[in-house]
Amino acid sequence: MLNVTTTPLQKPIDATNTGNSLQRQIIVILDFGSQYSELIARRIRETEVYSEVISYRTSAEQLRQLNPSGIILSGGPSSVYDDYAPACDPEIWNLGIPVLGVCYGMQLMVKQLGGTVERAKHAEYGKASIFIDDPTDLLTNVEEGSTMWMSHGDSCVHLPEGFEILAHTDNTPCAAIAHHGRQLYGVQFHPEVVHSQDGMALIRNFVYHICKCEPTWTTEAFVEEAIREIRARVGDQRVLLALSGGVDSSTLAFLLHQAIGDQLTCMFIDQGFMRKGEPERLVEIFDEQFHIPVAYINARDRFIDKLKGVTDPEEKRRLIGHEFIAVFEEESKRLGPFDYLAQGTLYPDVIESADTNVDPKTGERVAVKIKSHHNVGGLPEDLRFKLVEPLRKLFKDEVRKVAASIGLPEEIIRRHPFPGPGLAIRIIGEVTAERLNILRDADWVVRDEIKKQGVYSDFWQAFAVLLPIRSVGVMGDKRTYAHPVVLRMITSEDGMTADWARPPYELLETISNRMVNEVKGVNRVVYDITSKPPGTIEWE
């Protein structure tokens, strides 16, 4: 495994440890296992206030030291009466810090403070209209009858002393509650999800009016502080970055270059599975437009040789990853030595891969595991790097905002997500030079046409997949026996779930006509109408 420093978040490039205005206000989310915990943090940040997801096990004393402006208790899959139901430190209620419990978080608040939670007579899942009993404070500017997203089987039936009902639904008497004197609030619905009509109004009320936060978490402030922190951490040492061409690594390269200049070396390994024209365009943008030198490594023949005869998708991924490591090792030694490895780790990676619990012995928050970038995971032990991860506190949409603010071109900022193994896993079956050329040309038709028609940004992803079969066709009064191509176009907010796109038939027709006429070896185009779930975005 990659030998990196994993001390308790020691001087990471993040806004919570900088000692400036970015860290003075933070709202923390205690995570009880909700699928929406990350989304709550994103919604808070949309108000330009910093937010982090941390473990529900964090003690009241540790929260006191962190000194957040507010605390949110997430939802979760458990019932508060389950034998092993997760519970927070009950001293949290006595900190004098505003608390908002969401769904399970509200039920836990009620139970710990002496109220009663029972299995609901009528479980609520989906949209429900709320009727407001007290329009002040938390529910200011939330409309009567507003639609909110419900997902609960338990309900609060008796409130603790001092609490009052703020809103109800047809099936839930306590849809929103408050103890105004102690600034404790709860909602049975999920204001963070897009289906909740006035959810953001409620969140803004909690952030601005109840927690008294100011909008200081801005793109400009982050860029300024990130550059300062990179300089402070790296000093005069050298940094290596494996550039992929995506928005994350490109933004990271720009920030690092602004901070340390020629101490940065960007390495781009061309494994031969990129989209048409992308390797050349990447080097052109960085070399000519931004004057950031890129060490271009042409390893196409090595990678395709490794995949001869391989059809299993997991074996493809393994071999590509292994060969990338081999090339990376050789080239880093040739270009080095380096002290730091820069990675485009984002906040969702931190949430997924690092336990943000506190160490029971030291009281410090410890990263138990660092999730390596798909390109550099499993590097040999003798490559000893310290990590620098300036983007580790950002969500994807925040990275795009940073990229725009520092002047990266739209073609990078709005670039559709692309898998690490590239076109190799969009070719079902064996990868050959011939099949790569077919798919690369077919994929180019898709991208070129949606850009021409001005709808590129309407899709989360739009691409072609080459199947390991042939189909009969007729072209020029002659029988053909050629490849069918699958057209995959999807919409999504974050890639976690996705829906198949409903583009105009005229667009589908144009793409199909262009493919069979312009791409040698293709005589049929089919459209994938599978959402995620049950399918995945990629075919392999």
From Swiss-Prot:
| Keyword check for Metal-binding | no
Alphabetical list of SUPFAM superfamilies matching this protein: Adenine nucleotide alpha hydrolases-like (SSF52402), Class I glutamine amidotransferase-like (SSF52317), GMP synthetase C-terminal dimerisation domain (SSF54810)
Question: Which catalytic reaction applies to this protein?
Answer: XMP + L-glutamine + ATP + H2O = GMP + L-glutamate + AMP + diphosphate + 2 H(+)
One GO CC term of this entry? cytosol
Class of this enzyme? ligase
UniProt pathway: Purine metabolism; GMP biosynthesis; GMP from XMP (L-Gln route): step 1/1
Q: Does the keyword tRNA processing apply?
A: no
Boundaries of every GMPS ATP-PPase domain copy = 217-415
Write the record's keywords in alphabetical order, separated by commas.
ATP-binding, Glutamine amidotransferase, GMP biosynthesis, Ligase, Nucleotide-binding, Purine biosynthesis
Enzyme Commission numbers on file: 6.3.5.2
Q: Could you tell me what this protein does? A: Catalyzes the synthesis of GMP from XMP.
Official protein name in the record: GMP synthase [glutamine-hydrolyzing]
Q: What is the name of the gene encoding this protein?
A: guaA
